[in-house]
Amino acid sequence: MIWHVQNENFILDSTRIFMKAFHLLLFDGSLIFPECILIFGLILLLMIDSTSDQKDIPWLYFISSTSLVMSITALLFRWREEPMISFSGNFQTNNFNEIFQFLILLCSTLCIPLSVEYIECTEMAITEFLLFVLTATLGGMFLCGANDLITIFVAPECFSLCSYLLSGYTKKDVRSNEATMKYLLMGGASSSILVHGFSWLYGSSGGEIELQEIVNGLINTQMYNSPGISIALIFITVGIGFKLSPAPSHQWTPDVYEGSPTPVVAFLSVTSKVAASASATRIFNIPFYFSSNEWHLLLEILAILSMILGNLIAITQTSMKRMLAYSSIGQIGYVIIGIIVGDSNDGYASMITYMLFYISMNLGTFACIVLFGLRTGTDNIRDYAGLYTKDPFLALSLALCLLSLGGLPPLAGFFGKLYLFWCGWQAGLYFLVLIGLLTSVVSIYYYLKIIKLLMTGRNQEITPHVRNYRRSPLRSNNSIELSMIVCVIASTIPGISMNPIIAIAQDSLF
């Protein structure tokens, strides 16, 4: 009899849970329609892989790219809709979150064609690679819209787990295994630190997990200026710092960049920073609203260290991927300036604008590196000497992307940095802006050093890699060149017409 009653209670409880989940999906599912498209694409990939042979490989690329493009289209159709909180407060949709989701989808869409020939040449498993990329994209999108502490923790873990697997995808490469181990250990440690910071927020607010409810809880408990909030701020800053990889949380970045497959590095170098920037902006501005002076100081220190160390150490590098790793550390220092400035002086708009340009500049550079690596098998900077004599198109494309990263006019990178630094100057961050200007000059030096090598390498300097350089057939590499051309154009032309981009970025602010 007791067993019968317990069984009935279990059935009733299960039914209630199922009905609640069905109700949430029915009424809130439209708010995550772009994410649902990616989930459907993942299911299709698994179905095709389990029921087909190697001849259907083009379909895998087609489904991946189509699901990403359809997700972008769904986001654009939802633009300027009223902000809404769904799934019992776990997820928020507004223009600010959606523009970061758009940037993540754009990165992934450009990375798929960039990876095609690399996967074929290295004979990596194609389906798993695409699954990890789409799943990481999905995790990044959920992180951008996360509205409570649990989702903010689970979403980046989804992204991180796929990142660990992607970085160690070439299992026979010792450097790849080393990079994965460092990435995994430091990622696990940073996640633990982040959760510890969340626990302080949870306890101080009286058991609240939603971001806005945490603020209300801190007011009710009079804990908004307590030492516990300062402890939470420090731990959360360290945890998020791993995702953003500013100095001194950058130790994993050079090794992972050097050891991972180049298309994976291209994907991680932009998507992780976009998702982490969106999350950091909301966490610092909502739960830590009363501690703005403290987190401003912390971020200023991180920005200064990142801009100085990243650009100075990049000068000494001999590997192109390690150089870009340290360059990205310096670039995140510039982005942090926009986070500090905030909404009052167009700081977020300048950050979004610069990130859009950074995506095109960085992915364009990596597309050139992928092509050069496939044709020569090397990543050493000195092996690029005299590339212009063998492949002028590739050399000019790489030069334009590097000049844009350095911030030379009239390229997009110059206007992005100019807008970012101008907003910082208006907000009174004079010291940060001066450091940014000086370190930008340093970055121009090591970019120009590479460009000089590309264009003017003397015969005695040209290594056998370039001397024996052979262009592969156009049919096999046009997907990489397509991504490269799109990124090169986006790195140059938008600088001339900045106003529409800035207007869209300003329109996205919460």
Swiss-Prot record:
Compartment annotation: Plastid, Chloroplast thylakoid membrane
GO molecular function, one term: quinone binding
GO biological process: ATP synthesis coupled electron transport; photosynthesis, light reaction
Top class in the EC scheme: translocase
InterPro entries xref list: NADH-Q_OxRdtase_suN/2 (IPR010096), ND/Mrp_TM (IPR001750), Ndh2_N (IPR045693)
Catalytic activity: a plastoquinone + NADH + (n+1) H(+)(in) = a plastoquinol + NAD(+) + n H(+)(out); a plastoquinone + NADPH + (n+1) H(+)(in) = a plastoquinol + NADP(+) + n H(+)(out)
Keyword set includes S-adenosyl-L-methionine: no
Pfam families: Ndh2_N, Proton_antipo_M
TM helices/strands, residue ranges: 24-44, 57-77, 99-119, 124-144, 149-169, 183-203, 227-247, 295-315, 323-343, 354-374, 395-415, 418-438, 484-504
Gene Ontology cellular-component annotations: chloroplast thylakoid membrane
Membrane topology, as annotated: Multi-pass membrane protein
Signal peptide range in chain numbering: none
EC number: 7.1.1.-
Keywords in alphabetical order: Chloroplast, Membrane, NAD, NADP, Plastid, Plastoquinone, Quinone, Thylakoid, Translocase, Transmembrane, Transmembrane helix, Transport
Superkingdom of the source species: Eukaryota
UniProt main location, coarse: plastid
Similarity-based family: Belongs to the complex I subunit 2 family.
Function summary: NDH shuttles electrons from NAD(P)H:plastoquinone, via FMN and iron-sulfur (Fe-S) centers, to quinones in the photosynthetic chain and possibly in a chloroplast respiratory chain. The immediate electron acceptor for the enzyme in this species is believed to be plastoquinone. Couples the redox reaction to proton translocation, and thus conserves the redox energy in a proton gradient.
Complexes and interactors: NDH is composed of at least 16 different subunits, 5 of which are encoded in the nucleus.
Entry protein name: NAD(P)H-quinone oxidoreductase subunit 2 A, chloroplastic
Organism of origin: Solanum lycopersicum (Tomato)
